[in-house]
Amino acid sequence: MGAGKTTFYEAYLKEAFPTLVPAVREQQQPFLNDRRSFAVEDIRVDTQLLDEAKAAGYSTKVLFISTEDANLNVGRVLVRMSRGGQAAPASSVIDSYRESTKNLSEVRRHADDLIVYDNTAHDRGYRVVAHFTGGELGKAAQTIPDWAAKVFGKELHSAKQRGKPGRT
């Protein structure tokens, strides 16, 4: 909550994926069964869904968005609420922030592509931090935010040492 997932979807994905399926497995299954493309917005990536989708012939791409601090997300949610948007208690926003990165390192082994974005500087837009393809790091930003370093730290640091960072 407050990282910018819905804003990203509205700006960049809605045209290609007009159906945003809730993160409820029962509502996702018909899309898998009918082999229809869809997008899911959730705070935690369902690796089982990724595996099922790949087994059904889908190409899977995870776009993960976070910020440096849960309190930044709380502030954004408060602004959204003041404008009539969806309400959420600060404790829920903080819990969601913590929960969101718990399985992120594992996700890269389940998704065909994992693109990690930092949206801390709201006025500068989304910044690609890392791009994993087939579980392997393809590119990493020159500057890694602390939250991403905690998740992928050694791997991103090693990539820089090998001269693998790209223009992201």
Regions found by a protein language model. Give the residues of each.
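Glycine-rich phosphate-binding P-loop
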Residues: 1-12
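Glycine-rich phosphate-binding loop used to anchor ATP phosphates in small-molecule kinases
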Residues: 19-65, 100
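Conserved GTP-binding G-domain of TRAFAC-class P-loop NTPases and closely related GTPase folds
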Residues: 79-166
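Amphipathic alpha-helical transducer elements in NTP-driven molecular machines
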Residues: 21-25, 47, 70-71, 87-90, ...
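A contiguous binding-surface segment within folded domains or other stable secondary-structure elements
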Residues: 53-83
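Short, well-ordered alpha-helix to beta-strand connector turns
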Residues: 13, 35, 111-112
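Conserved nucleotide-binding/hydrolysis micro-motifs of P-loop NTPases
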Residues: 3, 45, 66-72, 121-123
